[in-house]
């Protein structure tokens, strides 16, 4: 009976988790099309995209898988949301990008608006994604694992990771 209740609880969380992952992906693509800036991870992903036949979504998925593997070796057991994040963010990025929904605006005001929209979408997406409490994304899981393993502050570990991928 307990397993059935857990499964029902898990299934009830899926729409919010998937919405959060979709919104996060839409925010990433919006910042990309603003042509005004991206997160260090997206800069890393675009560097790979520019030198391989991989799409941005595929690159995000492969990077996420590598990070999950690295995290596992330092003792971080990924949650269900971590694995779903790795797959679905990449899937949704490519889906949204191929849809042609976003276009780069011609004006600086339009570009700034799209960048701000993307940042807001990522912020709200994080809320939806974390609210279901099924685990952190691969990148945050790695950060949490390194903070515990190295006994260093979050700002230092997060900064070091993001500077490394730049």
Which residues make up each language-model segment?
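Core subunits and conserved enzymes of cellular information-processing
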Residues: 2-166
């Amino acid at each position: 009976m307990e397993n059935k209740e857990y499964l029902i609880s898990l299934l009830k969380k899926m729409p919010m988790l998937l919405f959060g992952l979709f919104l996060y992906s839409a925010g990433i693509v919006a910042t990309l099309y603003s042509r005004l800036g991206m997160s260090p991870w997206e800069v890393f992903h675009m560097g790979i995209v520019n030198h391989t036949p991989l799409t941005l979504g595929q690159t995000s998925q492969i990077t996420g898988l590598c990070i999950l593997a690295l995290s596992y070796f330092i003792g971080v057991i990924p949650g269900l949301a971590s694995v779903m994040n790795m797959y679905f963010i990449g899937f949704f990025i490519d889906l949204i990008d191929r849809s042609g929904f976003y276009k780069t605006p011609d004006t600086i005001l339009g570009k700034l608006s799209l960048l701000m929209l993307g940042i807001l979408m990522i912020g709200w997406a994080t809320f939806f994604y974390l609210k279901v409490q099924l685990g952190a994304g691969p990148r945050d899981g790695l950060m949490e694992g390194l903070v515990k393993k190295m006994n260093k502050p979050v700002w230092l570990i997060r900064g070091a990771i993001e500077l490394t991928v730049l």
